[in-house]
Amino acid sequence: MLFMKKKHPCRIRKRADFLAVRTGEKRRGPLFLLEVKSREQTAERESSLVARVGFTVTRRNGNAVKRNRIKRRLREAVRVGLTDDMEAGTDYVIVAHPDALHAPFTSLVNELSRRIKPKTKHQKRQQGNTNGI
């Protein structure tokens, strides 16, 4: 019996791919913004067997040392606990906020896992009704 091993997510490196994902769904959080787009929507030629992840840390987050540290923390958070939650054939771009540098690692992983999972219709309805009516 053959077992299919789940592939780790690949990295997004090209500007065109980052721009394509930018037009997809946005999931906001206190530590980062997660942009998600299915690769079928981007008409990608390559295989859609794995998820792809890109990281964006802008200059407003600090100098190069701080930006690189944020990227390392996010990469490790994705590697440690989120490869099972990511859908194959989907691109994810994580745009970091400055608070991601000093946030506890467990909260970073928990926030990522909460944002990676797609919302159901019921959750979207509950979130949209914030005025209590």
Curated annotation (Swiss-Prot):
<dbReference type="GO" id="GO:0004526">
    <property type="term" value="F:ribonuclease P activity"/>
</dbReference>
<comment type="function">
    <text>RNaseP catalyzes the removal of the 5'-leader sequence from pre-tRNA to produce the mature 5'-terminus. It can also cleave other RNA substrates such as 4.5S RNA. The protein component plays an auxiliary but essential role in vivo by binding to the 5'-leader sequence and broadening the substrate specificity of the ribozyme.</text>
</comment>
<feature type="compositionally biased region" description="Basic residues">
    <location>
        <begin position="115"/>
        <end position="125"/>
    </location>
</feature>
<keyword id="KW-0378">Hydrolase</keyword>
<dbReference type="GO" id="GO:0042781">
    <property type="term" value="F:3'-tRNA processing endoribonuclease activity"/>
</dbReference>
<keyword id="KW-0694">RNA-binding</keyword>
<keyword id="KW-0819">tRNA processing</keyword>
<keyword id="KW-0255">Endonuclease</keyword>
<dbReference type="GO" id="GO:0000049">
    <property type="term" value="F:tRNA binding"/>
</dbReference>
<protein>
    <recommendedName>
        <fullName>Ribonuclease P protein component</fullName>
        <ecNumber>3.1.26.5</ecNumber>
    </recommendedName>
</protein>
<dbReference type="InterPro" id="IPR020539">
    <property type="entry name" value="RNase_P_CS"/>
</dbReference>
<comment type="similarity">
    <text>Belongs to the RnpA family.</text>
</comment>
<comment type="subunit">
    <text>Consists of a catalytic RNA component (M1 or rnpB) and a protein subunit.</text>
</comment>
<dbReference type="InterPro" id="IPR020568">
    <property type="entry name" value="Ribosomal_Su5_D2-typ_SF"/>
</dbReference>
<dbReference type="GO" id="GO:0030677">
    <property type="term" value="C:ribonuclease P complex"/>
</dbReference>
<dbReference type="InterPro" id="IPR014721">
    <property type="entry name" value="Ribsml_uS5_D2-typ_fold_subgr"/>
</dbReference>
<dbReference type="InterPro" id="IPR000100">
    <property type="entry name" value="RNase_P"/>
</dbReference>
<keyword id="KW-0540">Nuclease</keyword>
<dbReference type="Pfam" id="PF00825">
    <property type="entry name" value="Ribonuclease_P"/>
</dbReference>
<feature type="region of interest" description="Disordered">
    <location>
        <begin position="114"/>
        <end position="133"/>
    </location>
</feature>
<dbReference type="GO" id="GO:0001682">
    <property type="term" value="P:tRNA 5'-leader removal"/>
</dbReference>
